[in-house]
UniProtKB/Swiss-Prot annotation:
Keyword annotations of the record: Glycosyltransferase, Metal-binding, Queuosine biosynthesis, Transferase, tRNA processing, Zinc
Role this protein plays: Catalyzes the base-exchange of a guanine (G) residue with the queuine precursor 7-aminomethyl-7-deazaguanine (PreQ1) at position 34 (anticodon wobble position) in tRNAs with GU(N) anticodons (tRNA-Asp, -Asn, -His and -Tyr). Catalysis occurs through a double-displacement mechanism. The nucleophile active site attacks the C1' of nucleotide 34 to detach the guanine base from the RNA, forming a covalent enzyme-RNA intermediate. The proton acceptor active site deprotonates the incoming PreQ1, allowing a nucleophilic attack on the C1' of the ribose to form the product.
Gene3D superfamilies, alphabetized: Queuine tRNA-ribosyltransferase-like (3.20.20.105)
Binding residues for substrate: 93-97, 147, 191, 218
Cofactor requirement: Zn(2+)
Residues that, per the record, bind Zn(2+): 306, 308, 311, 337
Protein source organism: Haemophilus influenzae (strain 86-028NP)
Pfam families, A to Z: TGT (PF01702)
Protein name: Queuine tRNA-ribosyltransferase
Cystine pairings recorded for this chain: none
Length: 382
């Protein structure tokens, strides 16, 4: 993988990731949003439908794909690309966040994490080395190191110990990645909770090891939005400018805008797909809750400014009807729209950076939403 930085507008960065795959050279224009395909599928969508929304890269889930279908079946198909028939780039998370989510079902040690398989109750073990081996079998174009996702709230001492162990795991991940002869990209993950000095130590340690990109982890786990913004403003300027920056698990449309304002290049989140299945649809001026009875006889398109298949062909009344009847097509049409909304938003962001009018775009974006523009502070990184 190669990262090319073309232009900046304030802190916002316009570039691309370039991948050499067996099928040819693929570019991912950044800032980019990655739809989440937890089990090797973006829920309800074929790969062709996902691509039609504008997506150029997907996220797969190492933890869940390891439990089902497992490495052996993946190897029989070739890799995850062959298994799910998506031959463009794939990023896989390491499984660290899913293990964190297990709560009392898991025990963290220096060696790794012992936990109870949520599917069959078996006791199993996941380590940095094992995560690298699973992601190697998945054929991930971007591999994430195995880390501990520091919970919120956490004391300074807990966050420090967690971050230090994640650094040791980062080195073990890097060593095993190299031993496997993996020619793809490996990203480090910056931890440290809401404590700036810990984030700085984490980043410095990761840079000393050397990675192809750097993710900001451990945010969007319950901390106030102001803390997320503060950490991003503090740490992003310190990340090497020639490496991509990835904010993990974020988020709402305004979170994407705020991340780009602070220098982030890559995002992923289940929000557009999960919200679609729950009837929450993103439109130019906010959200349409399609289950609201006021849409029962609304013959207008969901979003007149949207060019997706759903908006070009169907009315709000039809989407309301499908949802009311529990029809699978309703969830699919909603998902097509929400994914396209996110990709259109990213395309608008990229164009605004190219035109060096990103600050104006931010003002216009919040004006459409009827919301004030959040403050942007200049962090003191001395």
């Amino acid at each position: 993988m190669k990262y090319e930085l073309d232009k900046t507008s304030g802190n916002a960065r316009r570039g691309r990731l370039v991948f050499e795959r067996p099928q040819g050279t693929f570019s991912v224009e950044t800032p980019a949003f990655m739809p989440v395909g937890t089990y090797g599928t973006v829920k309800g969508m074929t790969p062709e439908e996902v691509r039609a929304t504008g997506a150029e890269i997907l996220l797969g889930n190492t933890f869940h794909l390891w439990l089902r279908p497992g490495q052996e079946i993946m190897r029989k198909h070739g890799d995850l690309h062959d298994f799910m028939q998506w031959h463009r780039p794939i990023l896989t998370d390491s499984g660290g966040f899913q293990v964190f989510s297990l709560g009392k079902l898991r025990k963290i040690t220096e060696e790794g994490v012992k936990f109870q398989n949520p599917i069959n109750g078996e006791r199993i073990f996941l380590s940095p080395e094992k995560s690298m081996e699973i992601q190697y079998d998945l054929g991930s174009d971007i591999v994430m190191i195995f880390d501990e996702c520091t919970p919120y709230p956490a004391t300074f001492d807990y966050a420090k110990k967690s971050m230090e162990m994640s650094l040791r795991w980062a080195k073990r991940s890097h060593d095993r990645f190299d031993e496997l002869g993996n020619k793809n990209a490996l990203f480090g993950i910056i931890q440290g909770g809401v404590f700036e000095e810990l984030r700085k130590v984490s980043l410095e340690g990761l840079v000393n090891i050397g990675f192809d990109g750097y993710a900001v982890g451990g945010l969007a786990v319950g901390e106030p939005k102001e803390d997320m913004h503060r950490i991003l403003e503090y740490i992003c300027p310190q990340i090497p400018a020639d490496k991509p920056r990835y904010l993990m698990g974020v988020g709402k449309p305004e979170d994407l805008v705020e991340g780009v304002r602070r220098g982030i290049d890559m995002f992923d989140c289940v929000m557009p797909t999960r919200n679609a299945r729950n009837g929450h649809l993103f439109v130019t001026d906010g959200i349409v809750k399609i289950r609201n009875a006021k849409y029962r006889d609304d013959t207008s398109p969901l979003d007149p400014e949207c060019d997706c298949y759903t908006c070009k062909n169907y009315t709000k009344a039809y989407l309301y009807h499908l949802d009311k009847c529990g029809e699978i097509l309703g969830a699919r049409l909603n998902t097509i729209h929400n994914l396209r909304y996110y990709q259109r938003l990213m395309a608008e962001i990229r164009q605004a950076i190219e035109d060096d009018r990103f600050d104006d775009f931010v003002v216009e974006f919040y004006a459409r939403m009827g919301k004030p523009v959040p403050p942007l502070q200049l962090a003191d990184n001395s």
